[in-house]
């Protein structure tokens, strides 16, 4: 049935998406309420400037504002570097076979199509043996350590704005349905072969898909009637043989290939590709005149046997077109484009062998019937057991080539019969003469990798290969034990300072942490220089004036009464006008030193200081004597084969070495066993029959004599000079066919004639199913461990270890002796909070301080390790089969082929009775 809709292609990872523009900053929340100022104390005598008061408790943090709306998607940035190619995902499940659609009418004959695409490169040859690694070069001297640069001052951090909440990532859209494949156009003229591309990394073999349903077998067609046999034609002249060429010199040995990684599990057998369109047959040349046989050339030495190429995939048989006349042989075209692989059907059960019918009398050839629809291809039957080949008898004498007989009407194409059980394979006979190379068919799609064969014996070491490019840096291994420290080299000059790195992207701001406890108050710092006077702020509005009462006379001052209880705090009055600042009072006497307050809680750890300069290396230790080599332990078990590593990049092509001497001629290898025969191809179209000549008159029948005794065949004489070919005599009228007589007894086999000329090679049949995997060879015995190598040189000093954890705090020391009376001591412990006083006026804003020095831009962070490629999605269902393309123009008719060699002579019938 037609193929289902083709699913999305699996394989490479797409380009990474472009990063979106960061969202807008969220709205900053309102500022928290300001705490109430304390109650003003009773103004006392102005003494010395007191110690600065303790800072009041900070107000509660304001409520975080609502996050701003997510910003619009920004302009896409530049595309990032392309990610590594992902591994091939598992093969998707095979979709169900679609229903068989109706066959459309044949389209009109289209014009010649445009030139086709360049053909795919041929299969890659097998990888040659890997050469022995060359000796390691001596380790270079260690470079001098540069002087560390001076750490720049850290600028004041800016106020980072609150980042808005990132918008939610949209859901991935549903992948669109792949469109149906277009109508295939006519096959164009093959284009030139393109340059072979670099071989890609080998993908992981996917799991085999489920087997498809079994197709129905077609009905067996009726045998067609045979046409009349034409008279023999004249024989052509034999062409002269050319001299043998001198043997060519052997080519240079190619560089060894890159060693492949560990192969994955065996994959399923690939599906068959479509069969290529058969090209027109070539025109037979005129027979040449027989020339004088030249001297026999010096036999060339057999060349080295090259590696066997990989077997190509089997293509899906295409739809048979109507047979056209055979055209002249065209120039060999370039290989066509690779077709899409079709689904592989399951191996069906062998069909039942039908009963052999009786051979009827051959009737006249009927008129050609219409081409029937091609039935569904049945599943291939199981491979039969290979049997022994029978003995090949001597070839019979070549028959005379008759004049083509009259063309009979083409009979109706019969339906293909059921495939019978494959017979035994015979012993392979001697190879026949090589036929002309057929026109290459359209290349089928490359099937999945076949199963891994057993490992063959190791070949001789090849020449040292070119040094490849460094491979992908692997994950850092565990640090080994530190080697002995080398002698420190002289300190080199300071390196050129690196370029300023790009500013990293601002990260998402974290949530505000809880407010920590106040640490112990530090010693008062030195009084800084007064800043520039700020601009005078606007004066506040004056409050409403109270009603002025009448001024009474001032009374005498009475004695002071006892202090009463403190009354409740009155309502806050309106702020009065700001008074002028009084003159600075004189410093009072220094008070006695107060007792030392208890130690406050430990404050948080400060930021880490800049890294100190690296100290000078210690003197090198004395190298100890190498210890005696220990006894070689027993070989450990083989480890599990790890997963295949990523293939390294192809190395640069090295300088071509001088041509080596030609090695001795190797012995000819034994002839391998014959492979299984391919499937029997469908019956080809019948050629156009020639016009019949006039039949000749039958001659008188003589007396049939008894067969003589077969004599001993004489030695082959020297061939005489070929005489001129006589003109054929007139052909008599054919007499009426007589009644069929009873079959005679089986006579003794006649003498086999000389072998006839080999006919032209037929079209290559489709590749047969792969043979069964051979029995894997036994693993060779493990060799004895080699002798221990010499002691290696000391390695370079390892990297500096990380800073260890901080040690525990020591016990507190005993208090020392009391010192002399010093200046004013530190502030004592904080007293209880006083009652909340009225809210004071808002102070005037001070001048904006100078902007701090911008900080040095930090280095870019270490780039993260790329993530693991995600799995590929399931393979979609197969797409529908497109309609058949237009039919191409018919080619010119070719010359008639030569008749095959004649069969064995039949048995001699009984002697006839002469009628007087």
From Swiss-Prot:
Biased composition (Basic and acidic residues): 10-24, 839-850
Subcellular location: Secreted; Secreted, Extracellular space; Secreted, Extracellular space, Extracellular matrix
The protein's name: Collagen alpha-2(I) chain
Quaternary structure (record): Trimers of one alpha 2(I) and two alpha 1(I) chains. Interacts (via C-terminus) with TMEM131 (via PapD-L domain); the interaction is direct and is involved in assembly and TRAPPIII ER-to-Golgi transport complex-dependent secretion of collagen.
Designated gene of the protein: COL1A2
Tissue specificity remark: Forms the fibrils of tendon, ligaments and bones. In bones, the fibrils are mineralized with calcium hydroxyapatite.
Family statement drawn from the similarity comment of this UniProt entry: Belongs to the fibrillar collagen family.
UniProt lineage: Eukaryota, Metazoa, Chordata, Craniata, Vertebrata
PTM comment, free text: Prolines at the third position of the tripeptide repeating unit (G-X-Y) are hydroxylated in some or all of the chains.
Function description: Type I collagen is a member of group I collagen (fibrillar forming collagen).
GO biological process, one term: extracellular matrix organization
Primary residence: secreted
GO molecular function: extracellular matrix structural constituent conferring tensile strength
Keywords: Calcium, Collagen, Extracellular matrix, Hydroxylation, Repeat, Secreted
Compositionally biased tracts (Low complexity): 96-114, 190-205, 261-281, 361-377, 448-457, 469-491, 515-577, 593-602, 623-632, 700-711, 785-800, 814-824
Keyword Calcium in record: yes
GO cellular component, one term: extracellular space
Region entry Disordered, spans: 1-167, 183-711, 732-916
């Amino acid at each position: 049935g037609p193929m289902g809709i083709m699913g999305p292609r699996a394989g490479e990872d797409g380009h990474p998406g472009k990063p979106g523009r960061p969202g807008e900053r969220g709205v900053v929340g309102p500022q928290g309420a300001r705490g109430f100022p304390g109650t003003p104390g009773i103004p006392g005598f102005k003494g010395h400037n007191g110690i600065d008061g303790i800072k009041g408790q900070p107000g509660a943090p304001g409520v975080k504002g609502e996050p701003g709306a997510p910003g619009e998607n920004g302009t896409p940035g530049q595309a990032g570097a392309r990610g590594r190619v992902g591994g091939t995902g598992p093969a998707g499940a095979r979709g169900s076979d679609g229903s068989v659609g109706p066959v459309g009418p044949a389209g009109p004959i289209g014009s010649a199509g445009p030139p086709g695409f360049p053909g795919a490169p041929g299969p890659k040859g097998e990888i040659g043996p890997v050469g022995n690694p060359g000796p390691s070069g001596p380790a270079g001297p260690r470079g001098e350590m540069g002087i560390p640069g001076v750490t720049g001052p850290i600028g004041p951090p800016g106020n980072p704005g609150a980042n808005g909440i990132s918008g939610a990532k949209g859901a991935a859209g549903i992948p669109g349905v792949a469109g149906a494949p277009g109508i295939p156009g006519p096959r164009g003229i093959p284009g030139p072969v393109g340059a072979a591309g670099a071989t890609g990394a080998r993908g992981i073999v996917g799991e085999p898909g489920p087997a498809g349903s079994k197709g129905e077998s077609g009905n067996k067609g009726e045998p067609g009637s045979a046409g009349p046999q034409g008279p023999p034609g004249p024989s052509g002249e034999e062409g002269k043989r050319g001299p043998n060429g001198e043997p060519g010199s052997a080519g240079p040995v190619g560089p060894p290939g890159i060693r492949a990684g560990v192969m994955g599990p065996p994959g399923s057998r690939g599906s068959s590709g479509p069969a290529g369109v058969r090209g027109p047959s070539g025109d037979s040349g005129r027979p040449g005149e027989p020339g004088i046989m030249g001297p026999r050339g010096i036999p060339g030495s057999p060349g080295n046997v090259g590696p066997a190429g990989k077997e190509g995939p089997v293509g899906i048989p295409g739809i048979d077109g109507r047979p056209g006349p055979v055209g002249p042989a065209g120039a060999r075209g370039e290989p066509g484009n690779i077709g899409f692989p079709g689904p592989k059907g399951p191996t069906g059960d062998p069909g039942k062998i039908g009963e052999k019918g009786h051979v009827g009398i051959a009737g006249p050839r009927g008129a050609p019937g219409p081409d029937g629809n091609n039935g569904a291809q049945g599943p291939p039957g199981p491979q039969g057991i290979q049997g022994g080949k029978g003995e090949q008898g001597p070839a019979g004498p070549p028959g005379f080539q008759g004049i083509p007989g009259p063309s009979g009407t083409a009979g109706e194409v019969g339906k293909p019969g059921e495939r019978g059980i494959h017979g035994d394979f015979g012993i392979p006979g001697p190879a026949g003469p090589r036929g002309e190379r057929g026109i290459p068919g359209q290349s089928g799609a490359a099937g999945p990798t076949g199963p891994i064969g057993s490992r063959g014996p190791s070949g001789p070491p090849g020449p040292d290969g070119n040094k490849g490019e460094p491979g992908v840096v692997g994950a850092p291994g565990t640090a080994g034990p530190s080697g002995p420290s080398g002698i420190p080299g002289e300190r080199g000059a300071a390196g050129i300072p690196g370029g300023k790195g790009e500013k990293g992207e601002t990260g998402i701001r974290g949530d505000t942490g809880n407010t920590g406890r106040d640490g112990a108050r530090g010693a008062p710092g030195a009084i800084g220089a007064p800043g520039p006077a700020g601009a005078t702020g606007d004066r506040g509005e004056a409050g409403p004036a109270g009603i002025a009462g009448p001024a009474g006379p001032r009374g005498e001052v009475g004695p002071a009464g006892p202090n009463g209880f403190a009354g409740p705090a009155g309502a806050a009055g309106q702020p009065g006008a700001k008074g002028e600042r009084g003159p600075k009072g004189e410093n009072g006497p220094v008070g006695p030193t107060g007792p030392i307050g208890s130690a406050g809680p430990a404050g948080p750890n400060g930021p880490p200081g800049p890294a100190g300069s690296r100290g000078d290396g210690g003197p090198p230790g004395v190298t100890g004597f190498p210890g005696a080599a220990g006894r070689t332990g027993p070989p450990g078990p083989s480890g599990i084969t790890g997963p295949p590593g990523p293939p390294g990049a192809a190395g640069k092509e090295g300088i071509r070495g001088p041509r080596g001497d030609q090695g001795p001629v190797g012995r000819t290898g034994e002839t391998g066993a014959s492979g299984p025969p391919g499937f029997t191809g469908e019956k080809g179209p019948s050629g156009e029959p020639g016009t019949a000549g006039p039949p000749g008159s039958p001659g008188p029948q003589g007396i049939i004599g008894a067969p003589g005794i077969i004599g001993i065949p004489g030695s082959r004489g020297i061939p005489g000079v070929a005489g001129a070919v006589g003109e054929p005599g007139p052909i008599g009228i054919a007499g009426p066919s007589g009644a069929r007589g009873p079959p005679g007894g089986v006579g003794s086999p006649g003498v086999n004639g000389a072998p006839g000329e080999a006919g032209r090679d037929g079209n290559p049949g489709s590749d047969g199913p792969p043979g069964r995997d051979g029995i894997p060879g036994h693993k060779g015995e493990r060799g004895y461990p080699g002798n221990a190598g010499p002691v290696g040189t000391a390695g370079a000093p390892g990297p500096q270890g990380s800073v260890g954890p901080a040690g525990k705090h020591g016990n507190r020391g005993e208090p020392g002796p009391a010192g002399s009376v010093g200046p004013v001591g530190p502030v004592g412990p904080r007293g209880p909070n006083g009652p909340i006083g009225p809210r004071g006026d808002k102070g005037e804003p001070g001048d904006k301080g100078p902007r701090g020095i911008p900080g040095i831009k930090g280095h870019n962070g270490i780039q993260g390790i790329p993530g693991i490629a995600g799995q590929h999605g399931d393979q979609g269902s197969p797409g529908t089969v497109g309609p058949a393309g237009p039919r191409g123009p018919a080619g010119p008719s070719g010359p008639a082929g030569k008749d095959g060699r004649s069969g064995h002579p039949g048995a001699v019938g009984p002697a006839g009775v002469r009628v007087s």
